[in-house]
Regions:
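Charged phosphate-binding loop/patch that engages nucleotide di/tri-phosphates or the phosphate backbone
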Residues: 9-12, 50, 87-109
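Short, acidic loop-to-helix structural element flanking the phosphoryl-transfer center
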Residues: 1-22, 29-34
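Conserved Lys-Pro-Asp/Glu-containing loop-to-beta segment of HAD-superfamily phosphomonoesterases
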Residues: 50-78
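Acidic, Mg2+-coordinating phosphoryl-transfer loop and its flanking beta/alpha structural elements
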Residues: 67-101
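A short, structured active-site edge motif that brings together acidic residues
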Residues: 21-37, 41-60
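A structural signal for isolated positions on well-ordered beta-strands in alpha/beta enzyme cores
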Residues: 19-21, 65, 82
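Short catalytic/ligand-binding loop motif for oxyanion handling, primarily in non-cytosolic enzymes
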Residues: 20-22, 29-33, 61-62, 73-76, ...
Length: 109
């Protein structure tokens, strides 16, 4: 799987300024966990394994912000909800959009 353009630079800078966690609802496919962890370690080596949260449902996550490409993950989140634009979510317009990682950087850095 390819890394989204500018994601590594932006996440690295965010990590220097904020408490960043990568949350994945990967439990639906538990056999994918080792590959996901390996991929994250390879492409985001500046993140510590304690910053990775694998869960069955993202509604258990609390924080100030959540960036996600799936609207249903944002609906129950109590903080600010940011929808990362993807082909499968173009019909949703009730969340603030982040169209790319440069926009994420502009918002937070």
């Amino acid at each position: 799987m390819e890394v989204n353009e500018h994601s590594q630079e932006v996440v690295k800078k965010l990590n220097e300024k904020y408490d960043v966690f990568i949350v994945s609802s990967a439990m639906e496919f538990p056999n994918s966990l080792p590959e996901k962890l390996e991929w994250l370690g390879e492409h985001f080596p500046f993140l510590h394994w304690k910053q990775f949260v694998f869960c069955g449902n993202k509604k258990v996550v609390h924080g100030d912000y959540m960036i996600d490409d799936l609207p249903h993950n944002l609906e129950t989140f109590n903080g600010e909800k940011l929808l990362f634009t993807a082909p499968h979510n173009m019909q949703f317009n009730h969340f603030q959009r982040m169209n790319n990682w440069k926009e994420v950087g502009e918002k937070f850095l």
